[in-house]
Amino acid sequence: MALAQRQVSCRIERSTGASTSQPVGSCLLVQRRPGQRRGVPARATPEFIDALSALVPNLPLEQIAAPCQVMKCGDIVYRSTLDPSLYNEAGFDEKTVALLAPVLAYLFLPPGVLPGAIDYYIRAPLKRKQTKAIDKNDIVLGKRLGTGGFGTVFKGELKEEGGVKTSIIIKKAKEFGEAEVWMNERMSRVAGHHVAEFVTAFDESLNVPLPAAAGKRAAPVQPTSPLDANSIWLVWVYEGDNTLSSLMERREWPYNLEPLLFGRELRAPRGPVRELVTIKEAFRQLVQAVAACHSVGIVHRDIKPANCIVSERDKKIKLIDLGAAADLRIGINYVPNEYLLDPRYAPPQQYIMSTQTPKPPPKPVAAFLSPILWTMEKPDRFDMYSCGITLLQMVFGHLRNDNALIAFNKRLQELKWDLPAWRREEEAKLPSAKGALAESLEAGFEALDADGGAGWDLLMRLLAYKPTDRPSAAAVLAHPWLTSAPGRTASLQHSLSGSFEATVSTAAAATSTALTAAGKSLGQAAKDAGLASMEEAILKVNQGALTEAQLMEELGLQEPAPVAPREGSQTIAWWQERQNELKARLVERREAMSESDPYGAAPSAMQVGSAINNARGGKGAKPTTPVKPTGPMAAAGAAAAAAAAAARVEAKVKVPNILGVKKPASGGGSNGRANGNGNGKAAPAKAANGNGSGNGNTNGNGNGAKQQLFGGLLGRKQQPVEEVQEEPEEEVEPEQETASKKERAFNLLGVFRR
C-alpha cells in the first residue's frame, strides 16, 4: 500500500551551484512520500537517459519543428537540382528493372501470353457481339466449287437488310469444323488481312425462320442427308477464283500473277528477271501470312498452293482452309499423337511436336507455359518445310505435277534429304533431257542461283531434315533472297543476252503437253519404285477423300492415331457456348426484321392463300378479300363468278365449259368460290367455268386490267381462245401425290424469290 502511494517524478533542471565538472542539464530523480521532507535529488544514470531518448521519438505525439523540416518540402521551384538524398526520394532502381524486364519479355514471346489474354478476354467477346447473326435462311446456295478432305465448298449469296447482296463462299465442314471456326475468328481479329475475310459460322441446329415479309427473298439451305445434321457451315467473303495452284497449272505462269499482285503487267521484257520479281513477291506474301499465324501461336499444317488464294480485292495472297490448323497457345485442335497433313507437302516428322508432349492443361496454365513449349519444340518449322515445297514448285515447272512431286519426295527420302545430292543427279540428266523437262530444270536452277545463290541457300534451309535447322518465318523474310533486288548478279545478266530467253518464249506453247507427258512417265517410274500406294492416296486427295485411314496406309502406320473425344474437348465446349449466344442474337434480329419489314411489303393474303391452296390441292384456304378485275371486260369476269357461286350451292355440280376457254395454270379446282374464266363476249351467267369445290374467295379472271398473280396475267388484250378437251385426271398414289404437292410448293416459293 505504501508502494502504491509512492509518487515518482523526474525533473531535469539546471544546477545552480554545480561544479564545472558536472554536466549541464542533469536528470534528477526525486522520490518522496506524503508528509516527507524533500530530500536531496539523486542524479539519473546514462543508461536511463539513452532509454528515454529512444522512447520519445516513437511516442504518438505531434512533432514540433519547422514546417519544411517536417514536410521535407525542400526547394519546390528548383527541386530537380537537389540531391535526392536531401528530400528522401529514390532514384532509378536498376534491380527492379532487371527483375521486371525478363517477365515482360516472357509475356511477349511467341505465341504471346499477354496479347493472347487481351484477345481472349476482351477482343473476342467484343468482336462476337459486333458480328451479325445469320443462319441458313439468310443464304442462297450457288454452284459447288469443289470437295476437299474436310468438306464441300459452294459459292452463294448473303442477303441482308435493305436488299443488299454479298457474294460469299460457303463451306459445309464434315469434320474439324469447330476448330476451323476458332482459327478463322482468331486470325480475323489479330491478322485479318492475311487470311480470307471470315463472316460467321453456324450449324444445322441454328435455324430461326425468317419473318413472313422476308421469306420471299431466299430459299433455306436444307440438309440433303441425315449426316448433314452435324455439319457446320462456314461463310467467307468472296475473294476470287484464283489460287496459286490454279495459276501455276497454266502455261502463262508467272506472268498471269502480275495483274493480280501488282494491278497491271510489268513493263520489263519477259525473261528470268521479270519472272523472278513476281515469284519473289508471291513467296514473300505467303511467308508473311505464315508469320502472322505463327505470331499468335497458330500452326497451319496444310500450307500448299491450293490453300493460297490470290485476293482480287486486296491484291495479295491470303491463306484459306484452316481446318487442320492447331492453336498451340491454349491447345485448340491439338492432340500430341494425332497428325493432320498432306503427305505431298508435309515434313518427314509428320507431327508438329513430339508425341511425348503431354496433353494441354487448362487454358490459363497452357497459355502461360506456351512460350516454353514453343521455344523447345519449334512447331512453326512444320509449316516452313511446306513453304519450301511450294517454292520448289514455283521455280521448277515439272514438279507442279502430282506424280512428279511424289517421285521427288521419294527420291529425297532415299537420299536422306540431301538436297545438293538431288541437284547433282538432276544436273547430270540435263544433257540427255529434252523439251519441257530440260527447260524447267535450267530455269529453276538459274533462278535459285541468282543473287549469288541466295535462292538455293534458302531452299536448302527450308527443306532441312531437322526442324531446328529450318529457319523461322521471320528469318525467311530477312533472308537476302527476299531483301535483295532480283537479277543483280553477272550470271543472271549474262543469261538475258543468251539463248535461254528465246527458248522460254518459243517453248511456252508446248509446256502443258510436255508436262503431262513427263508426269505420266514419272508416274510410271514411281510405280516401279513402289509408290503405288502413295499415288493412290494422292488421287484420293484430288477427289476430296483424304482421311486418317488413307494417311495411315500411305505412311505405313499400324495403329490409328487417337482422336480427342468431342464431348470433353475444349473446342466443343467453346462452340456450344458460342452457338447459344449466336442463337439469342439471331432471335433478336428476326424480331427486329419483323417489326421494321425492311424487305418491302409482304405478299397479299390472297397470294399467300392461293400459293398454299395450289400446293395442297385446294384445301384449307381461309376466306380472304376478293381481287376485283377492272377494265372494259371486267363484267364477264363478274358474271362468271356469279355463275360459279350459284353452281357451288348445288353440291359438286360442274358447270360445262360452253365457252371453250383454256383454264389458267392457277385454276383447276383450287381456291375461290369460283375460278370463272370469262372472255368478255358472253354476259350470261352460264358463260363460266366454275369449280365450286374450293373454299376460298372469288378468283375471277376477266380480260380487265393487267394483274400479276403467281405468273398468271389478267391482261387488257384479248387472247385467242382455243377449245381444249378436258382430260380425265389420273389416279395418283399417296406418295406421288405428296411429292407433287411439295414440288408445287417449292415452285411457288421460287416465284417469291424472283
Curated annotation (Swiss-Prot):
Binding site for ATP: 145-153, 172
Pfam families: Pkinase
Transit peptide: 1-41
Subcellular location: Plastid, Chloroplast thylakoid membrane
GO cellular component: chloroplast thylakoid membrane
Entry EC no(s): 2.7.11.1
SUPFAM superfamilies named among the record's database cross-references: Protein kinase-like (PK-like) (SSF56112)
Catalytic activity from the UniProt record: L-seryl-[protein] + ATP = O-phospho-L-seryl-[protein] + ADP + H(+); L-threonyl-[protein] + ATP = O-phospho-L-threonyl-[protein] + ADP + H(+)
Domain Protein kinase intervals: 139-482
Primary residence: plastid
Keyword Magnesium: no
Family the UniProt entry places it in: Belongs to the protein kinase superfamily. Ser/Thr protein kinase family.
Name of this protein: Serine/threonine-protein kinase stt7, chloroplastic
